[in-house]
Amino acid sequence: MVITLANDELTVQFKQLGGALSSIKDKDGVEYLWQGDANYWSGQAPVLFPICGSLRNDTAHYALKDGQEASGVIPRHGLVRKKEFELVEQTDTSV
C-alpha cells in the first residue's frame, strides 16, 4: 500500500513494503526521486537497515552488556527492505 501526504507545495508518498519514501513531487508535478527503471534494476531506493551488503553466513555476532556473546541472522541488505510496515498513525504532516 502507498501512503500519501500532501500540502500546497509538495506531495510525498511512502511504501508500506520496506517503509521507503518513494515519491516527492512539487506543486507542478516535478518528481524529485528516482522512480526506478526495470532495464537497470527492479527496485527503487530501499531502506537498508542495519546493514548494506551481506555478512558471512548471514550472521551478526555482538557482545551483550553482561559480557556474553550473542549472534543472530541478518539477511543481505538488512531486516526491513522486504518487510511490511504497519501504519500506526497518520496526520496531515506525518505518518
What residue spans do the PLM features occupy?
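Surface-exposed acidic/polar loop and edge beta-strand patches at domain peripheries
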Residues: 1-95
